């Protein structure tokens, strides 16, 4: 711990994403997933590159001021292939997936979607508004 207070410590800025889910604001650092990854009408919102051992945000960086969003709907064969390729981030580009990098976005789900935030919080939502707060905090490593 003393190293973190010394000259060898590195301080890096990290973006915070604020998700407004049906009007309730929930900040997150890493990711938000609506539905099953690569399932029917899924959405992956990435502020970091990885979810577990899957490289779902191959261009995403927690300090670039952008949110990486992948949306789409894959059949079971394409889903298996995309899941396999996501270990190396080579699932993109894909003709059935839309990928974009934005500062803010609003998505609507009908019916409400199951949402998982940073791998922990689970809830349902119909309207999802996202915005990034660049350099919201600093991490010392």
Stretch-by-stretch model annotation:
Residues 1-58, 63:
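Catalytic core of DAGKc-family lipid kinases
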Residues 67:
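Glycine-rich phosphate/diphosphate-binding loops and the adjacent beta-loop-alpha structural elements
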Residues 71-141:
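ATP/nucleoside-binding phosphotransfer catalytic cores, i.e., glycine-rich phosphate-binding loops
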């Amino acid at each position: 711990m003393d190293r973190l207070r010394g000259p060898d410590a590195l301080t890096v800025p990290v973006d915070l994403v604020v998700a407004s889910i049906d009007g309730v604001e929930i900040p997150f650092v890493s990711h938000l997933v609506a539905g099953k990854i690569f399932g029917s009408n899924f959405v992956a919102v990435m502020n970091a590159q990885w979810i577990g051992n899957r490289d779902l945000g191959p261009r995403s960086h927690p300090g670039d001021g952008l949110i990486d969003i992948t949306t789409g709907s894959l059949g079971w064969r394409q889903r298996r292939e995309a899941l396999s390729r996501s270990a190396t981030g080579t699932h993109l580009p894909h003709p059935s997936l839309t990928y974009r990098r934005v500062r803010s976005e609003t998505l609507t789900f009908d019916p409400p979607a199951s949402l998982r935030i940073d791998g922990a919080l689970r809830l349902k939502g119909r309207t999802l508004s996202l915005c990034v707060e660049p350099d919201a905090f600093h991490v010392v490593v």
